[in-house]
């Protein structure tokens, strides 16, 4: 895959990611970086980033990482996702996500995403499995 193809696939984010404010920073086959500003719209009643927003950030970066590693004609969807919440991320902070492969196989890919706060401390660690599929209408 050429650099142009990789960037086109990686930076062509779905509408849900744009709605969240997902910002892709860089995309390489073995590391994808992204960020998300924590706004009141993404918070829970305690004034910190909602767990669902953290999981959505991780799911989107994991999907992006898989998409740039797929053979031509294939697509992906999440098969399994597990999140360990470690620390809160407060409104006004930025959640930074780093996604790296644990396994890149023919039928599944497993990714680990570490989400950190602005102070660099880990807020969540997510492990997800993506299945490689042929898309059918």
Language model segments and positions:
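Terminal targeting signals and extreme-terminal segments of soluble enzymes
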Residues: 1-137
């Amino acid at each position: 895959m050429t650099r142009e193809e990789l960037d086109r696939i990686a930076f062509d984010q779905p509408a849900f990611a744009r709605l969240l404010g997902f910002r892709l920073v860089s995309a390489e086959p073995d590391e994808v970086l992204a960020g998300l500003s924590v706004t009141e719209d993404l918070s829970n009643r305690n004034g910190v980033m909602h767990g669902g927003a953290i999981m959505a950030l991780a799911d989107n970066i994991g999907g992006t990482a898989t998409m740039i590693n797929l053979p031509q004609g294939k697509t992906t969807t999440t098969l399994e996702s597990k999140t360990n919440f470690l620390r809160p991320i407060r409104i006004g902070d930025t959640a930074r996500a780093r996604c790296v492969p644990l396994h890149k196989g023919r039928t599944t890919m497993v990714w680990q995403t570490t989400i950190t706060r602005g102070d660099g401390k880990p807020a969540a660690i997510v492990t997800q499995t993506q299945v490689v599929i042929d898309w059918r209408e």
